[in-house]
Amino acid sequence: MPSVECNTTAAKEHVSEAERMIQMVKERIRGLLATLPFSHVPKRMKIEFVYFVILWLNAFPVKSGISQTISPRELLMRWHLDYKIHCRVQPGTYCEVHNEPVPMNTMVWRAHEAIVLGPTGALQGSVKLYCINTG
């Protein structure tokens, strides 16, 4: 692997590579928000969509990166994301999740309405959810 070159900048000076990356992340988030059928998106959902976009940007190798075949995420975590596990549900999908804090034999509603925020990035393929009732 090639050596890493560190180039520091002065205060108030822009780094074009970082600025381009920020612009690309914003474009991806805007694209994701445009696919949602909601007129209002809560702030917490927007924050989680940033995590979602960064997760997938780091899941693929970068042409100008350290390795041409290994993704930045795989370099750090030592394992890669699997399509069958981590792409089961699209972000913004409505779902009802089961909740049973204490076993009871009552007719209380045990499902919560939620919106999928994206995968957590864990090996098991867990998914982050936004509860509509509680936020």
Role assignments for model-derived ranges:
Residues 1-135:
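Nucleic-acid-interacting cores, centered on viral/eukaryotic replication and modification enzymes
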